[in-house]
């Protein structure tokens, strides 16, 4: 996701990938390992997004509006999908306004770029924060207009600080690098992050990646916001 040309830099991208690898995560396709879908950068796919936007206009699913293109939301319809964490979800299309998919400068919005990527890449599970939940009906409408099969959805709870407010700069530097510099081990950080909103059961708290992979189930993730407790992280780090 590098459509914001001012904020998206090679250094920023490298930092994200380095942090993921430090946590012990890897992937089969991506910007640094390649794959069958090009370089996996949205900035390289602008022509594809424009092509899809104009296809939607031709099929009367979208229309031009002052240089931009808006998706035409059908009225009085229900949009249903099953969420692994939140169960059956239903939205009334009348509560969703026509939304921009291509800006007047020909750049795609998040709704268009992410949805087209999910369709083109054959994504089967979309796991993201619950703050994106309200966007999901829009993405489903685009997918249906494109005649694509719907993936499974999973909207994960956000992380909150001990004060009950969403984790942010007010809670200090909570970046992966900051904890790494404090001496937090990657195994401990991975272990602790797994416990935020999920548990393998039987009061087990200390486990490795292989154990987490064997036990993890999206359906067992709690919908309630998880509290990031640095004291608990430090305790767990001591176990390693």
Where would I find each of the regions flagged by the language model?
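Catalytic adenosine-cofactor/nucleotide-binding cores of aminoacyl-tRNA synthetases and other
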Residues: 6, 147-152, 156-240
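Catalytic cores of large soluble enzymes that bind and process phosphate-bearing ligands
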Residues: 8, 41-48, 73, 131, ...
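A generic structural motif
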Residues: 2-4, 120, 240
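N-terminal Rossmann-like or analogous alpha/beta NTP/dinucleotide-binding catalytic cores
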Residues: 1-68, 93-94, 135-148, 188
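Active-site cores that bind ATP or allylic diphosphates and position pyrophosphate for catalysis
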Residues: 42, 55-169, 175, 200
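Internal, well-ordered alpha-helical segments in soluble enzyme and binding-protein domains
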Residues: 49-52, 67, 108, 135, ...
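Short linear loop/turn motifs
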Residues: 32-38, 68-72, 157, 204-211
